[in-house]
Amino acid sequence: MAAKDVQFGNEVRQKMVNGVNILANAVRVTLGPKGRNVVVDRAFGGPHITKDGVTVAKEIELKDKFENMGAQMVKEVASKTNDVAGDGTTTATVLAQSIVAEGMKYVTAGMNPTDLKRGIDKAVAALVEELKNIAKPCDTSKEIAQVGSISANSDEQVGAIIAEAMEKVGKEGVITVEDGKSLENELDVVEGMQFDRGYLSPYFINDAEKQIAGLDNPFVLLFDKKISNIRDLLPVLEQVAKASRPLLIIAEDVEGEALATLVVNNIRGILKTVAVKAPGFGDRRKAMLQDIAILTGGVVISEEVGLSLEKATLDDLGQAKRIEIGKENTTVIDGFGDAAQIEARVAEIRQQIETATSDYDKEKLQERVAKLAGGVAVIKVGAATEVEMKEKKDRVEDALHATRAAVEEGVVAGGGVALLRARAALENLHTGNADQDAGVQIVLRAVESPLRQIVANAGGEPSVVVNKVLEGKGNYGYNAGSGEYGDMIGMGVLDPAKVTRSALQHAASIAGLMLTTDCMIAEIPEEKPAVPDMGGMGGMGGMM
């Protein structure tokens, strides 16, 4: 076991804060409509230009172990916010940096870090409640487009195309983002469905950048039991291999020898296959397998109806134009199923919704209708160069996540205004403990930081703008894009309430952990001895 470097107290906390500041300062320049670009060097290919906070954060590793720990903890803030809300990563990073900076002053002055953290937690809980109260539902296409535009760095075209996609496939429908072939963004709606099961082994991945397994023109084998013996599968695998097409296997589970053989065949390029577990449980699993069968024009191979895996033929398999399998989701695009059968299946499920008694059953049945009838909307991002394409795709994906979050929990005034207005909930919050009250004050000041950073990136004077916004009420704020003051929602500057809430909660959570840290342990790298020089080669012995 390698030796460890163990450090305590203010000195190591300061190193951790240095790491926080290095990462946060790189991320914060991207915030707001006039946020700047960050250029990231890549080992292969051209540099990556981005305005996406989490992309910048993921690229940062620091040489000093203790500084790096601080940076990695803030990276977790951005990453968690991105996972939950899909956007707000830069706001979360700016909030975390502010809470840590303010909190460290109090810790250094001798206040109890645990009480400070309790005060921060109480303040955040009050702010979250207030954000819920001031959030407005986001229902119309216009509001959805506005949210999308803001998240895509004020690109109105992106907002409009996302609103159109949601209109076509419904708010529950599946929307994916792909590279386009032209200079313009395009929207393509294809019949398809998505379910929440991913590949059973990462060795099935064939697109390392997206971390997915993509199958073009595949067969689909649907089986309602476990597959562990490869001999059961061999007859159908041989038929698929002769057809020179990939295969997706959807079964209760694929394990042991069967999974190992599929992985080896895939790696060697003998037969491109991917195995996923069937979605749902019990009777719902059977129903969803049947949905996929109807969509792809195949049948569910089940002993209950007298079909066995060994006797399966290509006629029993479903087919699709393309299937994408990620870590957690599988998307079937353009199944070869009969349109009349799909419509009949949807009508049948809708009848079940009418007779269902529990809300849970109704919700699950509605999900199935959305998957069968809604289809998949594909946004094809257009750009002149590959570097621009990557940057635009980052923004479109951010905007898509933001609009979903807005539909879920409603919208609040954007541009950092909602957090300032939610401060009202803290003004009368007294904990009865001086150190906890100091924790509340830390959050009270930190909620100004996103607006301050937006103004700074736009070349304005943060203190002047914050004071003027605080003089106003409701949605009154500063639109950094146009340089005007006014009703933020009226000007179309909106943020999803879920994004603002997640950013605040995750920032406070990690910052609180940092403030209560008193010891850090890092591995001491072993010094490797220098390789000795090679001795000189002997002479050739006077050979002629």
UniProtKB/Swiss-Prot annotation:
Subcellular location(s) per record: Cytoplasm
Catalysed reactions, semicolon-separated: ATP + H2O + a folded polypeptide = ADP + phosphate + an unfolded polypeptide
Gene Ontology CC: cytoplasm
GO biological process: protein refolding
Chief location bin: cytoplasm
Keywords tagged on the record: ATP-binding, Chaperone, Cytoplasm, Isomerase, Nucleotide-binding
Enzyme Commission code: 5.6.1.7
GO MF term list: ATP binding; ATP-dependent protein folding chaperone; isomerase activity; unfolded protein binding
Secreted in keyword set: no
Binding site residues for ATP: 30-33, 51, 87-91, 415, 495
Function: Together with its co-chaperonin GroES, plays an essential role in assisting protein folding. The GroEL-GroES system forms a nano-cage that allows encapsulation of the non-native substrate proteins and provides a physical environment optimized to promote and accelerate protein folding.
Binding partners and assembly: Forms a cylinder of 14 subunits composed of two heptameric rings stacked back-to-back. Interacts with the co-chaperonin GroES.
Family: Belongs to the chaperonin (HSP60) family.
Protein name, as recorded: Chaperonin GroEL
